[in-house]
């Protein structure tokens, strides 16, 4: 049949319960009298419900039914108008009317049903339906009144009735019966002028043998499907033969004709040889399933077809005879049909009349469209599924059936097709696709899966769809946003080179955004975005989604609501490649091309909720099994909604906002300064001084149409760049900056290079006021296409962008300074202040950068809430000053600067102008004065500080003037405000003078200006109305002594001279700070040490000692700063040469820091057990070892100590020797001595490995300022030391700290800072780092470290080879002899008192020598002894500290020389005494032992050295007693390593001659010792 297909669909839902009351049910007879009525219990018609009854009448007007909300807005009224039924209803004061097509005043019985479905209300008369739909604000009807039939009581006051005049409407005249609410009968509350009527259409029980009577076209009809009889009245026996055996055989045959379908199988019967052409048909079958949706049976094509399916657990029938589709849905009263029980279906058609019944009880009857009565099909009969179910005409579902089908039979007047039996016996016309099993087996349920976190997802196989395809699934969630499905094709270059997005891909996606479901599709010619829901779908209920596509066109259905779509362009092919992602995207998206239109992907919104019944092209996907196979994190195989609200337990910390999600709470940490699931982790802070920035470089060019940006900031400046996206190829930017104390948002989308409307300039929004108050402020930006929203604290600004272009391109996210300046005309001012919690589209970039989670971060800013002193300049005298360009402050002004001084008075700033206009800022008697004249005479505002400000501390000054002429002066935290009337503009001209004036200008100053001299002190962070001048380079004129930096007047060790537990060492002309064990660097140990960030993929920094320069040590010192969040990883490991097995390892285990080392036999472990260190905060760990003794300390926490059990080595040796036979004494003694060596000496160190990658225990985070026995390996790595190799994810932060010293305060290299020597002979030393001086920095060799010295203990009688670099190993001898030091042991040391001036000690030649040395340098007593640190909480340590010292020596064949080492107090590194575990001691000097060339030589050396030791001691004592004969003066220039003249060995070598010759002239001088 070829007729025009009319898209006429209507749904008939009728449920008839048959029992004893059906035929006997009493009706109501209405006489049409005034004030007649029948009152029933209230019908709940608020959302979804049905009401039905039967009636007959012969009148054309009358009120049938009425209900309302008590006189407000809502009502529903059924009445007769001109013989037709009129439905009139209102919701939320929106009203509509529906009128039936059929005349009903014909004295025949008619069936009427009113169906409510939220905003839609339907009217069905005898199977023909119409509906009306409203668009109210709320999607439900308020029902307050009872239900009235036939009329409304007159005693109800009119104001309580919503519909005016309803009481005056004529009453109904006729019969009504079988009133039902759904399938239940309501209770009659009362009536008036109404009679009971026993007559009914089925009152005479016409059906026999248990047949069911129902109305059809107003006449009683019998349903005989459950009786075994046929005929009009179920009176004809239709059994096929007599006898019980036939019935048993028939039952057996029925049981055998069963088949199991699992979603991919189906049966196909070919009708091409015997086409169907019938006017009446019957289909019978039984099914059993857990599945909610699936095709059961289909035949026909185009406009002639029959489709039977399960749809959301109900049975759906769609029939089209050529003039339009008839659709019927049969639902059970309770539950669904997918309950895994058998259900029987019978469909009968006679001409246009169609009846479908399920289980013989639930019956639906209706009519097809117009007058077509013939069904024709020459196609196929599909059972259980089809090759492409979504493409079948009229198919309401897209997937195949899963479950069991039994006895599928089709018959008409001509043929009977037992389809199940034909498939089982293998009929030639029946094709079986897939593995169909002809018995009923259990089919695994498609269990739902629950995505518990936004990061959870699973991968699905490639979707092989080209021209057509279908996807269906159910989802359930309460969260408004989430990416549900995404897949894309192969990248292709766009032909238009001007396009901003130069690669394109076909893609398909489904996302939930703001509660609405969207389909996104691109088939090569542009993206379409289809909104598939009219109301929000995140209400926690299940929603069924069915997507069907044929070429460019298709439909997406959500709960039967269909939305058509058509793709752009001409292509009908969707070319996809790779996996399809369900629930979200993988963390590593390097291979993905994410379309800008897919906002959930750009914003990192993963789906949190449940998914079930996923079918792709009609075939089921067992997503639970896929999740288990992929071990998908955060995916569970169940779906239940928690009843309790998750936020009721207040899980969010630090004042974070809690939101209820899907079975979870969501903590919004914005504005708290914390992050984490419960906002429990403190976010990292970056400090900016105007020259610093953080730049995140995207791994690829980014294109977005939606952004979420949030952060906190704190600043005292009114101007400065906060955050900006920048592009290398366009002017595109999303920029946030401080502008006059407000936050300014500017979004500029460049239209130059792409085909879009010309840009109308950047969109700009402002929010906030006076934000430069040095308090934390929270900024949020939300952009969705053209919509912009800026929130600063509680101030909200919103805007809409003009034009059609919404795509933002960027390569970088920049903070502090904008480095990408090619496409901007005005560069924003640099930022001075602090940033925290920068989150851009779900990524917390500051913490990601700090922890090494991203490898594309350029970091020049400093971590931590630091006191920011930007670009300080020192004005050394009161006559010093400089001039800058005129201050531009005509209408408003924001000035900021910092100062530090000891002078009570002085000019800070002055600028004159036209007429009397001027501005001056000065210090008067220690207080700030702000003096100005705008033309109305001079005014002065005085700061109200609590005390004078000339206290040599930094102070902050903010001066503002707004458009209302309100002036404010803020000094530190004290504010003074004054409103000035009159002139508002400040018209300045001439130069701006800083820190003073030219000498002749002081006599011509305006009134109220008190200063007559310049400012002496330091100025920093100068901000002149948004301009950050460089006071030195931008100066137009300079006069006097002006220097960059601010050293201050202190030249002696003060309590705060050295920061971060650095050790202050008093020098001749100042002091130096030993920063070696602090992880910091700089003159005062307040600059970060060389810092590397190790990424999550692991990295390794490997230092290898040269083969001939490998040290062996008795004691070691190790310090490093770190921050990390990993629970397990190796920070540093030092290994001996292959085969020896000695090692030392610093690691984190279960979040706690520990050290394990082995120096001979067993592993020795020491651990900080109290507190985990993987909290993301910065920690400094210090480790010391002396033999088997060790200490470990984190920050200022208590020290952890380890001492070996037992007595000293010698005591143990003597005990053992008493029990050994005499002849075995010698070999046993040699063996025990060798074991003793192994227990105390770290032999032949070969390499230092940093990062743990070589051992498989990766460290992730940052490491800073690593120090080990004189080596700063990270500094060496930053300087590209040839002995260091770097591989993996390792990134240097910023630059290697450059250090410049001054004559006042210098800083020695940390590894050399403890090598100030006091000896009885003059010895040369070597340095292993760059010397810091004011003039220049001279590089030296890094090769000679601790390996350059030879140790001096009982194990040192092995051969020591001199360094091969003669220029760096030089000895100087005076008096014509070589000095030798005796052997020493730890027992020789006592806690002797030494000079408070130098804090140095000597190795003990004798107690008298120590006392003499101490007393010889007691003349200089500063305010605080050198060696004092700013750390009062630590316990005092013993005074004697011997630190590692690289020294040079000479070796001859008979005499051993050893350096004598002095060191200042080092209180912050507690160490252990190797022989006295009961007393806390610090170790001796780092002892370095060369590798022995042979064991035999060592044994011989021990015997020889014992005698030699005695001779050396006697010789030293003799020389001491005769010191006057060989006296000399120790030249301080040789003893201070920090002196630039000795910063490398070559210079020292050149001085040898003068040193020797000068010795004779000094022979008769008094003894002098400089320390």
UniProtKB/Swiss-Prot annotation:
**Tissues and organs where the protein is expressed, per its UniProt entry:** Brain and arteries (at protein level).
Kindly list the positions annotated as binding Ca(2+) 3: 1142, 1159, 1241, 1243
Q: In what way is this protein post-translationally modified?
A: O-glycosylated; contains heparan sulfate. Heparan sulfate attachment is required for synapse development by mediating interactions with neuroligins.
> Which keywords are on file for this protein?
Calcium, Cell adhesion, Cell membrane, Cell projection, Disulfide bond, EGF-like domain, Glycoprotein, Heparan sulfate, Membrane, Metal-binding, Proteoglycan, Repeat, Signal, Synapse, Transmembrane, Transmembrane helix
The topology of this chain with respect to the membrane is: Single-pass type I membrane protein
Q: Which residues form the Laminin G-like domain?
A: 28-202, 258-440, 447-639, 685-857, 871-1046, 1090-1290
Q: Where does Ca(2+) 1 bind?
A: 304, 321, 374
Residues that hold Ca(2+) 2 according to the record: 732, 749, 807
Could you tell me which cysteines form disulfide bridges? 202-213, 207-222, 224-234, 404-440, 610-639, 647-658, 652-667, 669-679, 1018-1046, 1053-1064, 1058-1073, 1075-1085
Looking at the UniProt entry, the stretches that span the membrane are: 1497-1517
Q: Membrane side Cytoplasmic: which residues?
A: 1518-1571
A Pfam family recorded for this sequence = Laminin_G_2
- Topology, Extracellular side: 28-1496
Name all EGF-like domain ranges.
198-235, 643-680, 1049-1086
Give the UniProt subcellular location, in the record's own words: Presynaptic cell membrane
Q: Signal sequence: where?
A: 1-27
From the UniProt record, which GO molecular function terms apply?
A: calcium channel regulator activity; metal ion binding
Region Disordered: what ranges? Answer: 1324-1348, 1539-1571
Q: How is the quaternary structure described?
A: The laminin G-like domain 2 binds to NXPH1. Specific isoforms bind to alpha-dystroglycan. The cytoplasmic C-terminal region binds to CASK. Specific isoforms bind neuroligins NLGN1, NLGN2 and NLGN3. Interacts with CLSTN3.
State what this protein does.
Neuronal cell surface protein that may be involved in cell recognition and cell adhesion. May mediate intracellular signaling.
Q: Which family does it belong to?
A: Belongs to the neurexin family.
Q: What is this protein called?
A: Neurexin-3
């Amino acid at each position: 049949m070829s007729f025009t297909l009319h898209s006429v669909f209507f749904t008939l839902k009728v449920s008839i319960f048959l029992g004893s009351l059906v035929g006997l049910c009493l009706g109501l007879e209405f006489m049409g009298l005034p004030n007649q009525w029948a009152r029933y219990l209230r019908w709940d018609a608020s959302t979804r419900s049905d009401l039905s009854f039967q009636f007959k009448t012969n009148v054309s007007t009358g009120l049938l039914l009425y209900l309302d909300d008590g006189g407000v807005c809502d009502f529903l009224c059924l009445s007769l108008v001109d013989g037709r039924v009129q439905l009139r209803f209102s919701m939320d004061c929106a009203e509509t009317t529906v009128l039936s097509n059929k005349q009903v005043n014909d004295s025949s019985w008619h069936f009427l049903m009113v169906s409510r479905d939220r905003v839609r209300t339907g009217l069905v008369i005898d199977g023909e339906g119409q509906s009306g739909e409203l668009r109210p604000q709320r999607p439900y009807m308020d029902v307050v009144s009872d239900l009235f039939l036939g009329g409304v009581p007159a005693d109800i006051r009119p104001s309580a009735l919503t519909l005016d005049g309803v009481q005056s409407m004529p009453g109904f005249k006729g019969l009504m019966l079988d009133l039902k609410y759904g399938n239940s009968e309501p209770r009659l509350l009362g009536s008036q002028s109404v009679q009971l009527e026993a007559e009914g259409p089925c009152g005479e029980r016409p059906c026999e043998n248990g047949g069911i009577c129902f109305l059809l076209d107003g006449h009683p009809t019998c349903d005989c499907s459950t009786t075994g009889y046929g005929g009009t009245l179920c009176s004809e026996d239709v059994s096929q033969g007599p006898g019980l055996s036939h019935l048993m055989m028939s039952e057996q045959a029925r049981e055998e004709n069963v088949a199991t379908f699992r979603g991919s199988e189906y049966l196909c019967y070919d009708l091409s040889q015997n086409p169907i052409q019938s006017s009446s048909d019957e289909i019978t079958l039984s099914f059993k399933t857990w599945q909610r949706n699936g095709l059961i049976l289909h035949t026909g094509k185009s406009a002639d077809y029959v489709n039977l399916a399960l749809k959301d657990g109900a049975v759906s029938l769609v029939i089209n005879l050529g003039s339009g589709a008839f659709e019927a849905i049969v639902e059970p009263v309770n539950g669904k049909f997918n309950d895994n029980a058998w259900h029987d279906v019978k469909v009968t058609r006679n001409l246009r009349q169609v009846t479908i019944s399920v289980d013989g009880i639930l019956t639906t009857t209706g009519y097809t469209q117009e007058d077509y009565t013939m069904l024709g099909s020459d196609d196929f009969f599909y059972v259980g599924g089809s090759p492409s179910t979504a493409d079948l005409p009229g198919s309401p579902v897209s997937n195949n059936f899963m479950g069991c089908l039994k006895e599928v039979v089709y018959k008409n007047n001509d043929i009977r097709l037992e389809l199940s039996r034909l498939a089982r016996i293998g009929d030639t016309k029946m094709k079986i696709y897939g593995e169909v099993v002809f018995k009923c087996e259990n089919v695994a349920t498609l269990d739902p899966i629950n995505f518990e976190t936004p990061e959870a997802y699973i991968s699905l196989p490639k979707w092989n769809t080209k021209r057509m395809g279908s996807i269906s699934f159910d989802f359930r969630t309460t969260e408004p946003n989430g990416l549900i499905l995404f897949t894309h094709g192969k990248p292709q270059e766009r032909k238009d080179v001007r396009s901003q997005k130069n690669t394109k891909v076909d893609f398909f996606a489904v996302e939930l955004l703001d509660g609405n479901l969207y389909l996104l599709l691109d088939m090569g010619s542009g993206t379409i975005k289809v909104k598939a829901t009219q109301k929000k779908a995140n209400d926690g209920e299940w929603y069924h989604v069915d997507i069907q596509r044929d070429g460019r066109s298709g439909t997406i259905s959500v709960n039967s609501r269909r939305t058509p779509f058509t793709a752009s362009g001409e292509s009908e092919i969707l070319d996809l490649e790779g996996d399809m992602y369900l629930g979200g995207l993988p963390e590593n998206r390097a291979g993905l091309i994410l379309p800008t239109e897919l906002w959930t992907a750009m914003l990192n919104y993963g789906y949190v909720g449940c998914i079930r019944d996923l079918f792709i092209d009609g075939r089921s996907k067992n997503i639970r099994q896929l999740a288990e196979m992929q071990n998908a994190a955060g995916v569970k195989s169940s779906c239940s909604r928690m009843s309790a609200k998750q936020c009721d337990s207040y899980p969010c910390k630090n004042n974070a906002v809690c939101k209820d999600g899907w079975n979870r709470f969501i903590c919004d940490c914005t504005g708290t300064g914390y992050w984490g699931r419960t906002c429990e982790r403190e976010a990292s802070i970056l400090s900016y001084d105007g020259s610093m920035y953080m730049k995140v470089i995207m791994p690829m060019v980014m294109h977005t149409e939606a952004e979420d940006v949030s952060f906190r900031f704190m600043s005292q400046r009114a101007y400065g760049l906060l955050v900006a996206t920048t592009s290398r190829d366009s002017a595109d930017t999303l920029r946030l900056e401080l502008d006059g104390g407000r936050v300014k948002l500017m979004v500029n989308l460049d239209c130059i290079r792409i085909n879009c409307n010309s840009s109308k300039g950047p969109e700009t929004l402002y929010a906030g006021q006076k934000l430069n108050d040095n308090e934390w402020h929270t900024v949020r930006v939300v952009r969705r296409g053209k919509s912009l929203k800026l929130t600063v604290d509680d101030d909200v600004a919103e805007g809409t962008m003009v034009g059609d272009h919404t795509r933002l391109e960027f390569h970088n996210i920049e903070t502090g300074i904008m480095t990408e300046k090619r496409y901007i005309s005005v560069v924003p001012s640099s930022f001075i202040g602090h940033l925290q919690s920068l989150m851009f589209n779900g990524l917390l970039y500051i913490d990601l950068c700090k922890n090494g989670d991203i490898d594309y971060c350029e970091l020049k800013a400093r971590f931590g809430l630091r006191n920011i002193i930007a670009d300080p300049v020192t004005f050394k005298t009161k006559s010093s000053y400089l001039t800058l360009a005129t201050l531009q402050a005509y209408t408003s002004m924001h000035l900021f600067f910092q100062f530090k001084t000891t002078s009570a008075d002085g000019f800070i700033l002055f600028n004159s102008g036209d007429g009397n206009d001027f501005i001056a800022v000065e210090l008067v008697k220690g207080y700030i004065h702000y003096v100005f004249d705008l033309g109305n005479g001079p005014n002065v505002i005085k700061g109200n500080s609590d005390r004078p400000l000339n206290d040599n501390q930094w102070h902050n000054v903010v001066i503002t003037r707004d458009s209302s002429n309100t002036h404010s002066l803020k000094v530190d935290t004290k504010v003074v405000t004054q409103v000035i009337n009159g002139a508002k503009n400040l018209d300045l001209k001439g130069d701006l003078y800083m820190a003073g004036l030219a000498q002749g200008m002081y006599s011509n100053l305006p009134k109220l200006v008190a200063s007559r001299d310049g400012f002496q002190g330091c100025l920093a962070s100068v901000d002149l109305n948004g301009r950050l001048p460089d006071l030195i380079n931008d100066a137009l004129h300079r006069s006097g002594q002006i220097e960059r930096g601010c050293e201050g007047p202190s030249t002696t060790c003060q309590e705060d001279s050295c920061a971060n537990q650095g050790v202050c060492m008093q020098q001749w002309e100042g002091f130096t700070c030993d920063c070696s064990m602090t992880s910091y660097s700089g003159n005062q140990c307040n600059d970060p040490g060389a810092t590397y960030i190790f990424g999550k993929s692991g990295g390794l920094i490997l230092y290898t000692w040269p083969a001939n320069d490998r040290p062996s040590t008795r004691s070691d010192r190790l310090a490093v700063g770190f921050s990390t969040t990993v629970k397990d990883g190796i920070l540093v490991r030092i290994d001996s040469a292959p085969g020896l097995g000695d090692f030392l390892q610093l690691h984190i285990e279960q979040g706690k820091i520990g050290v394990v080392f082995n120096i001979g036999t067993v592993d020795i472990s020491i651990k900080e057990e109290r507190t985990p260190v993987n909290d993301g905060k910065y920690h400094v760990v210090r480790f010391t070892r002396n033999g088997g003794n060790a200490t470990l300390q984190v920050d200022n926490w208590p020290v952890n100590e380890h001492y070996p059990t037992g007595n000293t080595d010698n005591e143990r040796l003597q005990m053992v020797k008493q029990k050994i036979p005499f002849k075995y004494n010698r070999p046993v003694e040699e063996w025990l001595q060798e074991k003793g060596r192994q227990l105390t000496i770290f032999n032949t160190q070969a390499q230092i490995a940093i990062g743990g990658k070589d051992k498989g225990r990766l460290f992730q985070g940052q490491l800073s300022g690593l120090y080990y026995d004189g080596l700063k390996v990270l500094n060496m790595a930053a300087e590209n030391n040839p002995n260091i190799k770097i591989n993996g994810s390792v990134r240097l932060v910023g630059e290697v700290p450059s250090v410049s010293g001054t004559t006042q305060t210098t800083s020695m290299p940390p590894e050399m800072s403890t090598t100030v020597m006091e000896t009885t002979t003059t010895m040369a030393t070597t340095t292993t780092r760059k010397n810091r001086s004011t003039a220049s920095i001279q590089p030296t060799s890094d090769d000679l470290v601790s390996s350059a010295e030879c140790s001096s203990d009982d194990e040192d009688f092995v051969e020591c080879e001199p360094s091969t670099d003669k220029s760096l190993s030089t000895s100087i001898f005076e008096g014509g002899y070589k000095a030798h030091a005796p052997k020493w042991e730890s027992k020789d040391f006592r806690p002797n008192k030494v000079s408070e001036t130098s804090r140095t000690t000597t190795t003990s030649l004798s107690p008298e020598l120590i006392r003499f040395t101490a007393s010889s340098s007691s003349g200089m007593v500063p305010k605080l002894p050198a060696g004092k640190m700013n750390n009062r909480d630590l316990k005092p340590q013993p005074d004697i500290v011997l630190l590692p010292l690289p020294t040079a020596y000479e070796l001859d064949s008979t005499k051993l020389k050893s350096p004598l080492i002095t060191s200042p107090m080092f209180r912050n590194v507690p160490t252990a005494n190797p022989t006295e575990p009961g007393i806390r001691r610090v170790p001796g000097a780092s002892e370095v032992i060369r590798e022995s060339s042979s064991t035999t030589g060592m044994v011989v050396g021990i015997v020889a050295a014992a005698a030699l030791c005695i001779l050396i001691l006697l010789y030293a004592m003799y020389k001491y007693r005769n010191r006057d004969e060989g006296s000399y003066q120790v030249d301080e220039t040789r003893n201070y390593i920090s002196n630039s003249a000795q910063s490398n060995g070559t210079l020292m070598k050149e001085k040898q001659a003068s040193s020797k010759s000068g010795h004779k002239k000094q022979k008769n001088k008094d003894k002098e010792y400089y320390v």
